[in-house]
Design a protein with these regions (language model features):
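Solvent-exposed loop and edge beta-strand segments that line ligand/cofactor-binding
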Residues: 165-169
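Conserved amphipathic alpha-helical segments that form helical-bundle/coiled-coil interaction surfaces
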Residues: 99-162, 174-186, 191-201
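Hydrophobic side chains within alpha-helical segments
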Residues: 37, 53, 89, 93, ...
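Short arginine-rich
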Residues: 201-211
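Short linear motifs at protein or domain termini
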Residues: 1-99, 209-221
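Short secondary-structure boundary/capping segments
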Residues: 61, 170-172, 192
Length: 221
């Protein structure tokens, strides 16, 4: 069935806002006002309401009676749970993927890692990091697991983005990525699983620290 123009518009608004939330262009707590968004995207309120409803359903926005819709905050506990989900699933994905990775797959991942090392814009770093991991996990042939990981990454995105602004974190990540590729090339599925688990857990600790710092800052203000 062909989508209506309103559905197409809603999808476009949703994808744009989702990307802006995931990359912290729209920070937690930022208001998502229907009038402003309708004017910005040149659409009626109908597709905007649909897009906002989808963001709320995805856990990316919060709708409060008489207060409108805003970008959702994550509690430290919610972040921990999402990180636990990620390391469990990503560890399993790489474990399943390693036996099926060809030299061409490794070469493609290496190319992405080379691009990542040269990237200077945080947006580009974020995108290439995602593509690097996704290129490896795809060989696991577990679309539902991958979908769950993508959902968790999306919900963490507004906080995942911040660690990439630190050169120390970028350098550490580069070392871990190169080690992961060596393990994949050697066919060491268990070693790769352990490396991915360590990588995700470390990132998770940074995110929880950021959330706690923001919470303290709000309390002080």
């Amino acid at each position: 069935m062909k989508e209506s123009s309103s559905q197409v518009a809603a999808g476009s608004v949703y994808e744009t806002l989702r990307s802006e939330i995931a990359t912290a262009v729209l920070e937690p707590g930022a208001p998502l006002k229907q009038d402003h968004l309708a004017a910005r995207f040149g659409v009626s309120h109908v597709p905007v309401r649909e897009a906002l409803s989808r963001l709320v359903a995805a856990g990316l926005a919060t709708a409060r009676l008489n207060k409108g819709t805003s970008v959702a905050f994550l509690s430290a506990r919610e972040a921990v749970e999402l990180i636990e989900l990620r390391w469990l699933l990503e560890g399993r994905l790489i474990e399943l993927a390693v036996p099926h990775l060809s030299r061409a797959d490794i070469a493609r991942a290496t190319g992405l890692l080379d691009e990542l090392g040269k990237a200077r814009q945080v947006e580009e770093v974020f995108r290439l990091n995602h593509e690097f991991h996704a290129s490896l996990y795809a060989k696991a042939d577990r679309p539902l697991l991958l979908q769950s990981v993508e959902s968790a990454r999306l919900n963490l995105g507004r906080y995942l983005y911040l660690p990439w602004k630190s050169k120390t974190n970028v350098d550490r990540s580069e070392v871990e990525h190169k080690k992961l590729l060596r393990l994949c090339l050697a066919g060491d599925a268990q070693g790769a699983k352990a490396m991915v688990t360590e990588h995700v857990i470390h990132t998770g600790k940074l995110i929880v620290e950021i959330i706690e710092q923001q919470k303290t800052s709000v309390a002080i203000d």
